[in-house]
Regions:
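Core AdoMet radical
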Residues: 27, 68-69
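Charged catalytic cores and adjacent phosphate/nucleic-acid-binding surfaces used
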Residues: 1-63, 74-226
Length: 226
């Protein structure tokens, strides 16, 4: 992949998604200032988009959204400039650094990211890694209110080491009428597995109708607009 964080090409991922029966997929490689990741940058984003669109044309029967998972910087700014973000079909903003900020700072950080009109969703909201990293001190109710206000979706990350949103946060999000999406966080072609995410969502009383990417593609595209 572009960032080096994944293990298969976009074409291989698209083919694997189709083989799993998916009707559409979002390719969201990393855009990050972290030195260990190459990723999407202002100088190469046009080639990134062109490469994925070219791969998508080779696999009929599945729709492909060209996206990115973009770092939320410690001050809440988004790593990529808006002129890049607006060219993407689907943009997830996530925290990958500065996990120990105060409750006030991390909440302001997430809310500021949500207010960017080009951000489609917030990924793994509390940034926890099961058994390895505690959640941030985020004020979750405040974040849910901002998500509702800004029409920003929240991710139910189905990876077994994320499960973020957790079940309680899923229930809170549903009560707050916040849009939800479920992702597999796939980093290779064998990782298209929603099982853990489905279990988490069901414990949070989430139904299929509560998750945007259960919708047909055209309705999903309409609903995801801010």
């Amino acid at each position: 992949t572009w960032s080096g964080d994944g293990h298969n090409t976009p074409l291989e991922m698209i083919r694997a998604a189709k083989a799993r029966g998916l009707k559409y997929i979002a390719i969201t490689d990393h855009a990050s200032p972290l030195g260990m990741l190459k990723g999407i940058k202002p100088h190469n984003y046009k080639k990134y988009i062109a490469d994925i669109r070219a791969a998508a044309k080779k696999v009929p029967g599945i729709r492909v959204l060209v996206g990115a998972e973009v770092d939320i910087l410690p001050d809440g700014k988004i790593y990529l400039p808006n002129y890049v973000l607006k060219e993407l079909d689907w943009t997830v903003a996530s925290v990958h650094t500065a996990f120990k900020q105060s409750k006030e700072k991390i909440t302001q950080r997430i809310v500021r990211a949500m207010r960017n009109p080009h951000i489609s969703a917030i990924g793994h909201l509390t940034a926890r890694i099961v058994g390895r990293r505690e959640p941030t001190l985020l004020d979750v109710p405040a974040a849910l209110a901002a998500a509702k206000e800004t029409n920003t979706a929240l991710e139910i990350n189905a990876s077994w080491y994320r499960l973020d949103l957790n079940d309680l946060h899923c229930r809170m999000a549903k009560s707050a009428d916040v849009k939800l999406v479920m992702s597999t966080d796939s980093h290779d072609e064998d990782a298209f597995d929603f099982a853990f995410g489905l279990g988490t969502a069901r414990r949070g009383w989430i139904e299929a109708r509560d998750v945007l990417n259960t919708l047909p593609f055209e309705r999903f595209v309409k609903e995801m607009k801010k």
